[in-house]
Amino acid sequence: MLLVSGGDDRQDQVLVRPRRGDIIGRIEIPRIHVSVIVLEGSDSRTLRVAAGHVQGTALPGTIGNVGIAAHRDTFFRPVGEIRPNDMITLTTLHGIFRYRVDSMEIVDPNDVQVLNWTKDAELTLVTCYPFYYVGSAPKRFIVHARQQD
């Protein structure tokens, strides 16, 4: 949750972190027909029923890197079709936030720096790769996007 209070020419942001399992919002990627609820947490139980906001990353609408993960064989199956300049919308109780895809990359599972804090409002999508691999996938497919609002 984000609480904002204005004063003079500045805004102070006070974050109240959601608890694991809380509804964060909905992520939509219209060109590839993705529309899925996002819950707080990226543990296996959460990812069975929704996409998950990676705990410790920024919340939508704040400065920093918002991390969202989902399984490649369910909700994020179409993410392999994503392209630069595709639009991603995150709808939350605190607003609608639009992001434009900058780039995609494939990384090792331990390359968690893709979720590091950033000085700009960004979004990082994470799913396993290859998309049609049988078993535990050896890589991660990463989508980087920048907030447009």
Question: Could you tell me what each predicted segment is?
Answer:
Residues M1-D149:
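Solvent-exposed, non-transmembrane regions of membrane-associated and secreted proteins
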